[in-house]
Amino acid sequence: MIFATSSTQLQTGVSTVAFRGWDNNLRLTNDSVELIATLDVGPRILAYRKHGGFNPLNIFEDQAGTSGENVWRNRGGHRLWTAPEHKVKTYFPDNAPVEWEQLGECHVKLRPPPETSNGLQKEIEIQLDPVGTGVTLVHRVTRIGKTPVTLASWALSVMAAGGVAVVPQPEMGEHPRDLLPNRNLVLWPYTDMSDSRWHFGKKYILLRQDATRGPTKIGLSHQIGWSGYLVGGVFFLKRYAWEPEASYPDNGCNLEIFTNARMLELESLGPLTELGSGESLEHVERWELHDAHGTFDVKSEHQIHQLLQPIVSAPGSYFAKVDGH
């Protein structure tokens, strides 16, 4: 059933609001946060913030409130693509209105028009926890063409300028005990390993967004299953799965990070899957939002570790003290 709720802003639930030039948007709220997704294009999740707080998602000012173009627009926010990237198929113009269905008090499904030239139907389910900042996103792709295709879901969050991406690394091993590799690092043709925006540390890989610099990107087979972004006094935390027996796109990547002068993207990917006609795949992300006030050196693992230690819990001794950093 496709329907709308009252535009009255609710303490907990779903309402419709105008936002940043778009007239038709869903607002999901609970006691802690609000999440806003536009129905005029996309779908795009445009805002995710504590009440009265900073929105870590980027919205491009020159594209805010626009719709109906015949070419693809980034616009910012969070979106669903499919991998591997293709200069035509990937950039299907998603500039038309989005249908929606309410599945629960703070649970909706967004469905754009089908990508007929690609033979795909995309959907994003958004479920806000009853309390706290947690959000569960289910990204779904269904094959509506006649012939099988192999692809992966690709969930991209366009983050606000001026922050730092944080990717945890596995514990250090020992030689000769640990003889086999435990991670992949994938580079793009425009990635310069001497770029000062990158910091490849003992505990973390860090990438700083810089308004004066051009594109750079890496991908990883990331088994730890979370990454995040520090900006504006908040830490945006994204969790995702790693399936060790699965094949992932881009030489085995389930996590990719891209930045340019305008923004930074945190991107999680699902396994490569062959879809026959009528078959679907799903890819789940879990979001959290935490206060992270204080100054820090973007190349100081110790300072960032101390900032994040109360926020992110991980099994084992991952958050053991980082000495000498």
Residue ranges and their predicted role:
Residues 2-140, 144-325:
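Surface-exposed acidic/polar loop and edge beta-strand patches at domain peripheries
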